[in-house]
């Protein structure tokens, strides 16, 4: 009985740990996209409109087991250089399509927005998620503000 109780407590915590680990892997992967955007901004004085202009592969080719795609979007505004990092799966309630075990993050999109530097400052990145999951602890603390991911 004690083993059953311990298992009932430990299993959900372990599953949450696994999801957070997958999110961290996705955050590490997006660093290469950030670097390409920063280089483009340094050379052209503005943010790229899309992956091609940034010298990156197509969004679906920037992927991993835990990332469906990474798309550069300007939203028609060259002052905006957002990266949209889409997680695989389906976010529709009741849908069982979560092939990578991302839980509430399946099918959601995390956005990374650069802060335009003043003079020679380094570029800072804001992170946000618009389709906020019910399990917000799965999202890194720095990404829990949905407004920081939009222009």
Language-model region placement:
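Periplasmic/extracellular, small/polar-rich flexible segments of pilin-like filament-forming proteins
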Residues: 42-151
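N-terminal single-pass transmembrane signal-anchor helix
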Residues: 1-34
């Amino acid at each position: 009985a004690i083993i059953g109780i311990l298992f009932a407590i430990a299993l959900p915590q372990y599953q949450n740990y696994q999801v957070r680990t997958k999110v961290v892997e996705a955050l590490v992967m997006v660093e290469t996209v950030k670097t390409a955007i920063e280089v483009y901004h340094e050379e052209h004085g503005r943010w790229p409109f899309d992956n091609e202009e940034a010298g990156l592969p197509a969004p679906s080719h920037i992927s991993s087991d835990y990332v469906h795609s990474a798309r550069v979007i300007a939203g028609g505004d060259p002052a905006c250089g957002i990266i949209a990092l889409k997680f695989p799966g389906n976010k529709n309630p009741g849908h069982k399509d979560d092939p990578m075990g991302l839980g509430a993050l399946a099918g959601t999109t995390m956005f990374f927005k650069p802060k335009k530097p003043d003079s020679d400052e380094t570029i800072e990145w804001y992170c946000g998620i618009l389709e906020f999951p019910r399990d917000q602890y799965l999202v890194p603390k720095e990404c829990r503000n949905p407004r920081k991911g939009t222009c």
